[in-house]
C-alpha cells in the first residue's frame, strides 16, 4: 500500500509543506478505504 509521507520539517518551504499535507490527505484516504 501507500507509504506514509515524511514530514519535511518546520523549516521547509511552504510548497513542501503543502505537498506533504496533500500527500498525507491522500494517504489517509487510501488507508481508510483499504481498511474496510
Swiss-Prot record:
Tyrosine amide sites (modified residues): 36
Protein's cellular compartments: Secreted
From the record, give the cysteines joined by S-S bonds: none
Task: Say which domain of life the source belongs to.
Answer: Eukaryota
Q: Which residues form a coiled coil?
A: none
**Matches recorded under Gene3D superfamilies:** 6.10.250.900
Tell me the InterPro entries matching this sequence: Pancreatic_hormone-like, Pancreatic_hormone-like_CS
Question: Which UniProt keyword terms apply here?
Answer: Amidation, Hormone, Secreted
Q: Quick one: where is this thing mainly located? A: secreted
Q: Would I find Secreted among this entry's keywords?
A: yes
What role does it play? Hormone secreted by pancreatic cells that acts as a regulator of pancreatic and gastrointestinal functions.
**Annotated family:** Belongs to the NPY family.
- Name listed for the protein in its UniProt record: Pancreatic polypeptide
Amino acid at each position: 500500500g501507500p507509504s506514509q509521507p515524511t514530514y519535511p520539517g518546520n523549516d521547509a518551504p511552504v510548497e513542501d509543506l503543502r505537498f506533504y499535507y496533500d500527500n498525507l490527505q491522500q494517504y489517509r484516504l487510501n488507508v481508510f478505504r483499504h481498511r474496510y
